[in-house]
A protein has these predicted regions:
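Intrinsically disordered, low-complexity regulatory regions enriched in Ser/Pro/Thr/Gln
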Residues: 1-261
């Protein structure tokens, strides 16, 4: 099962609320992210015109920021590989789970390490160009990071920073997001259901232990779990890793990092 003792000791075992399990399962599986995604988009675009939000952007200091982002990704893969229960899964399931959840885990890593970044207009990007090209944008251009996407990512990060999660809370939240039985094509889905339930139980318990007077913290952490799943894979890849890996396939790179000793 999920190696609770590998991540943090001294958790109690009183939580058995199946309704909470169902709610958290839906959120962690990405099924309840629509509401928060709409709320995030409203917050980030309420005071900005649509054409402004479509502006394509890039990192202001790509060398330094990409180096930090790469370090966060390496730590993320190390966390995943360090879980004995993850290593017990078939290699195909391991690959599928990582491909599905690497962005939420990476965003949690950015938040945990308090990584801030600045962006600037991408070369050859202008509001007029975005308006004129509109639906005629090529696939490559459409994948470029937009100001709206960066705003959404920053909103997620600030939400997590305001929660000020402990290392234990981050660890269990990562575990609950990693073991997602809703991922298509899993051969050990029932086992993964148990792993996610154990992770979410431990998350609830550690929140109760660390914040016994905060009755809303658990639900706020659930909102954070939903928020990180709204961040697009292409945004993270293009913004933080494309300047380094070029045309290398990001999913292939992740698979190599996972299985190469």
């Amino acid at each position: 099962m999920f190696p609770l003792e590998e991540i943090t000791p001294n958790t109690c075992s009183g939580y058995r609320d199946q309704r909470g399990h169902t709610l958290l399962y839906n959120i962690l599986s990405g099924r309840a992210s629509g509401y928060l995604n709409t709320k995030l988009n409203h917050n980030t675009t309420a005071h900005n015109c649509r054409c402004e939000q479509r502006r394509t952007v890039c990192l202001k200091d790509p060398k330094a920021t990409c180096q930090v982002a790469s370090s966060v990704l390496v730590k993320t893969i190390h966390f995943v590989r360090s879980l004995p229960s993850f290593n017990q899964l078939p290699s195909g399931d391991q690959s599928s789970l990582l491909r599905h959840c690497w962005v939420p885990l990476f965003v949690l890593g950015l938040a945990q390490e308090k990584i801030a970044f600045e962006v600037t207009d991408a070369p050859n990007s202008s509001i007029l160009r975005q308006i004129l090209l509109g639906p005629g944008l090529t696939e490559k251009e459409a994948e470029r990071p937009t100001l709206a996407g960066v705003h959404s990512l920053r909103t997620c990060l600030h939400y997590l920073w305001n929660l000020d999660l402990s290392p234990k809370e981050y660890a269990y939240l990562k575990g609950a997001l990693l073991f997602n039985p809703a991922v298509q094509g899993l051969s050990a889905s029932l086992f993964i259901v148990g792993l996610q339930q154990e992770a979410q139980r431990a998350l609830h318990e550690v929140i109760h232990l660390l914040h016994p007077e905060d009755n809303f913290r658990f639900s706020n952490v659930l909102k954070a779990a939903s928020a990180v799943q709204t961040v697009g894979h292409s945004l993270v890849t293009e913004l933080f890793f494309k300047p380094v890996i070029g045309n290398t396939n990001m999913l292939h790179l992740l698979t190599e990092m996972l299985f190469v000793q």
